[in-house]
Amino acid sequence: MAEAKPAPEKEAAAKTESVPVETEGEGPSVKEGSTSLVSIDEYLAAGVHIGTQQKTQDMMRFVYRVRTDGLYVLDIQSTDERIRVAAKLLSHYDPSRILVVSSRQYGQHPARMFSRALSTKSMLGRFIPGLLTNPQIHGFFEPDIVIVTDPAGDAQVLKEASSIGVPIVALCDTNNLTSNVDLVIPTNNKGRKALSLVYWLLAREVSRLNSTPFNYELTDFETPL
């Protein structure tokens, strides 16, 4: 049986605060005294904080700064915190009932490795409409919870999971809408290294919470060039 559906992220904050403009040398950080899953330098090196030059009202609460070139920068502390929250949520589910999906090229290998590490179900590449809603389709699967790499690229999965009441965890960039997302992980969801780091951390944290072995290095999750 599926866990109770988490509180949805379907509405952004009523008011959007002005976002400070980033000057040279400034970058996202975590609060003093807090401990991140990996060092801030590792997050920065992977480009997890790098957003796009577009932003949505939904994602503004996760924006740290906007650079002088118009690029929105995500708050690494929020990313780190949301990975922990998502891992805790996922740890309560039977892995065989968890579905991870990615249509994005650079998300497919990390999602595949996440699935392998935790023994979850994965659907990678082009998603055939009806796989979550039509029992007559070959490969039909009704998960208890879904992880999507990009709400835009995985829009059909998002639509079907939402229609059957399945909770959705999504990796969301600054340009994403989150209307059908139940738990947002704010991150660069287009970069090769960013996606590998987020999926690796998520898998590692779920394994830790479930007290199961995790024998994978970050490089195992990186899409080969």
UniProtKB/Swiss-Prot annotation:
Q: Which InterPro entries match?
A: Ribosomal_uS2, Ribosomal_uS2_arc, Ribosomal_uS2_CS, Ribosomal_uS2_euk/arc, Ribosomal_uS2_flav_dom_sf
Q: Pfam families given for it?
A: Ribosomal_S2
User: Biological process GO annotation list?
Assistant: translation
Q: Where is this region: Disordered?
A: 1-33
Annotated signal peptide: none
Spell out the GO cellular component terms annotated for this protein, sorted alphabetically and separated by semicolons: small ribosomal subunit
Compositional bias, Basic and acidic residues, is annotated for 1-14
Domain of life of the organism in this record?
Answer: Archaea
Arranged from A to Z, the UniProt key words for this protein are:
Ribonucleoprotein, Ribosomal protein
One GO molecular function term of this record is: structural constituent of ribosome
- Give the similarity note: Belongs to the universal ribosomal protein uS2 family.
Q: What is this protein called?
A: Small ribosomal subunit protein uS2
The protein's gene is named rps2
